[in-house]
């Protein structure tokens, strides 16, 4: 997984040159070499990986066209036209007949004029435990997904349901409630590269007081149906299970004066700093 959103934006002369290389390569492809994509695989190829025009219509009928585009696009980093042409042919040779299959975002994005990422997956920092922190985190997720990247987020940084929020004299709705917002944005709003819904993985650690609610909500498909919900299980938890020991569910002490400044979801770092945790139940 990658933590930085890298996008490609070939424009002007560079993009035109990659198109020229692609067309030159396509001329070398005989009709007998064109792989027909029919049935389910044809639909997947057309919907997910073939190049689309400004109206969303596929302009690539065969994998050979896709491979030539990807090869020419990847070769643009070479310093001279001669090297670019040489590496276009080398990349094409590797891709041909599915001998080498790169990530889906490379296949759909390389050699295009669009601002999309070449990375399939991103793990972004946990949201700061505040409304603004959650919204900023959501914006980052949406930005990555709009450029075709999948996103993973650990929500253990958010205080448990019912915990006091002094600034507004209220109580927290908890990470499961916020997870529904992330899920809705992914399922109903985002289209990755205009071809598919966003891909989201939401996580919570095994020590978080809301971990059981996080597990139970998976049974109700009407609530969080736009994300994969996963529990981060530690070696300590597995050892406790093996030895038949109790397991505490806890969270940082919200009364700590440095909570807002220091808490970022890393419980080990919090403890190492000499900070207290509050056990909610065992």
Say what each PLM segment does.
Residues 1-282:
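Extended catalytic cores of very large enzyme megasubunits
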